Amino acid sequence: MAIISSKKQPPEPNGEPKQRRESAKAPSTENILKPEAAIDEQEQQEEGIRPHRFADYIGQKDLKDVLDIAIKAAKSRGEVLDHLLLYGPPGLGKTTMAMILASEMGVNYKITSAPALERPRDIVGLLVNMKPGDILFVDEIHRLSRMTEEILYPAMEDYRLDITIGKGSSARIRSLPLSKFTLVGATTRVGALTSPLRDRFGLIQKLRFYEVDELTQIVLRTAQLLKTPVTQDGATEIARRSRGTPRIANRLLKRVRDYAEVKVSGVINESIASEALQLFQVDPCGLDWTDRQMLSVIIEQFNGGPVGLETMAAATGEDTQTIEEVYEPYLMQIGYLTRTHRGRMATKAAYKHLGFTPPNEQLSLL
């Protein structure tokens, strides 16, 4: 069963919107759900950690500048925000950015994912319930079905819904006006979107990996919200092992917090953070056991590559999509993996990190 996540933002006494989570009330949307949007204790805690304003959002300065201009321009003209496509690796803050947009615009938002929109009536139920200016966030938008995409075309471009009534020669199309809304799509595979859908987004922006100093600020902020004592060097140690990703940084902080509470009952410093992350098999470069296994397979079984994606998936036991979207981006970012038309190859840096001798240096030893 799936539930759409819906947010209303009634004004506070100071005039600023306040965020609050509710289930969608319309019967037509109750079965449209994003699996990750199920409301539980863990998500409520994560909701408290999320920033709700640009001022609280750390990193992604270029993206924030672009969106800040778009928001101010839309407000000055009394228009809705243009449709926005956000792309980049998972965990960089695409969903959070959609929530911030709603907060900055003073409107409500709804969250769903493309796999949940299986039938045309699913997206229809969402669209007809949108209020003027509302934001509809669709995660994994590259996975929309063809029929759902075709319904979105006139909805995005002309704010109308074209419904076919009847069948065969007696069929006719009826157009229903929709409230002007903003569609925010998120994807890890922007190239998988069809051109007609991609071209209907007025703004297309990429989220980049975070720098260590940005992640350090995020860890310190999260620790303060969780009432977890952590030193600057302890936060930095967690940050540099977080793969440039805030979601991972917050997750590692919680694991280190558990370790500190059980083992030392004290403040998280660099030494404690290092001990805890070593226990969880996260090395100083942020590689976990699976990352190291993938690189080891390429080096030991395939002499450093090139290795095809399907072959690597079979050798490691991971599915191809997980390899492409979760592991490869960071390994390529830090220079441990390269992709060629023939397949994946481990770099000299990967050899040295895992304690292997690079092939050219092996020849020099003969």
Swiss-Prot record:
Its EC number is 3.6.4.-. One of its GO terms (molecular function) is ATP hydrolysis activity. Signal peptide: none annotated. Residues 15-24 have a biased composition (Basic and acidic residues). ATP binds at residues 49-50, 91, 94-96, 157-159, 200, 210, 247. One of its GO terms (cellular component) is cytoplasm. Residues 1-50 are annotated as: Disordered. Homohexamer. Forms an RuvA(8)-RuvB(12)-Holliday junction (HJ) complex. HJ DNA is sandwiched between 2 RuvA tetramers; dsDNA enters through RuvA and exits via RuvB. An RuvB hexamer assembles on each DNA strand where it exits the tetramer. Each RuvB hexamer is contacted by two RuvA subunits (via domain III) on 2 adjacent RuvB subunits; this complex drives branch migration. In the full resolvosome a probable DNA-RuvA(4)-RuvB(12)-RuvC(2) complex forms which resolves the HJ. This is Holliday junction branch migration complex subunit RuvB. It comes from Nostoc punctiforme (strain ATCC 29133 / PCC 73102). The gene is ruvB.
